[in-house]
UniProtKB/Swiss-Prot annotation:
UniProt protein name: Putative glycosyltransferase C06E1.7
Documented EC number(s): 2.4.-.-
Single GO MF descriptor: galactoside 2-alpha-L-fucosyltransferase activity
UniProt GO cellular component terms: membrane
An example Gene Ontology biological process: carbohydrate metabolic process
InterPro entries, A to Z: Alpha-1-2_FucT (IPR052501), Glyco_trans_11 (IPR002516)
Organism in which the protein naturally occurs: Caenorhabditis elegans
Keyword tags: Glycosyltransferase, Transferase
CDD domains named among the record's database cross-references: Fut1_Fut2_like
Amino acid sequence: MSNYNKPIQLLCVLVVVLFFINNQFVQRTTWSRGLRSPPLDSRIFQEKSEIERSTLPPIPKGFLSSKLASTARLANHIFELVSVYGMAKSLNRKPAIFVEDSKYNLLITGVRKVLPGLLDEFQIFEYPVHNKATKVPLSEKCCIFDNPDKFNNISSEYLHLTGHFYQSWKYFDKYKEKVQSFVKPAIDFSPLPNSDSSNFISRICIHIRRTDFVDGQHHSSNVSFIKPALEFIKEREQKDVNKKMLTVIMGDDPDFEAKMFEGTVRAKKEAKIEETTKYFVSENTPQDDLAYSHYSCDATLITAPSSTFGWWLGYLSKGQAVYYQDIRSTNDVNYKKGVLDPDDFFVPSWTSIMLDENKKVVVVT
């Protein structure tokens, strides 16, 4: 190789090196300025991570619990726990139960028999609420909505409500689909009829309390309203005249219920069901009655308007065609004393009915 060519080769190598250095500098500069896109697989991973982060629920900022009316009945327990669940979600907290005594365990067991999914949402502490909890009053009147959003700025890990009952759809109705999914799986409800393509079940929800609902203060169920109300519902809800309409009656006084309609069958396991049978009295547990409503009741009639059990039969029902006797047309003590606001207690999509002066059923708007 001649001495003449060597400088040229060195010059060429130098040019290549300088080009490489300059190219690396440009790449780093554009990367730092965000002008260069990362490789496709990196972008896909980054976008996926951002989507996952945006769809993850926020981390709860603590627990929400409440004093519970442990000596009350099943439907009152359901109201309290579902409302605490709804409020906890709205306040970005985990619903919790502090077990104060053995009655709390009975409460939990009773609700779990019909809404097992609801209890799965709760953190259950096997001891009373501790001193670290911030206690706040809410809903001093059972059936008037008290907006819990006022507690949004409380940062305490444990927020404990000292109200009771929380009987308003407004505490949880935006989570209605989820609440209904908490109902236990269907079981064999026979000899009660199931809702299928060949029949229509008009569900009468009767919760007659012979202990206190006939005390002259609460409005209890009575035949003079039930019979015309049922006929009214049949006319409104029967979409196909060829369908067989059946009525299932549920309540706390089977003897009374069995006498309302001729040919009524008390649906015990050994009961003989004729093809012509149209009226059934349930002999199931309250939990199974609620589950039956969820899977089979196309229409529901609540004849004792302040009955919380009747309320839940309607709210959990399959068909969501719920009718109730207008409480303003009665002398029910809860309404008269101002502890129940109909707009807070009754779901707006439900139909309020009453008897006019001619004993004709009319819709109350």
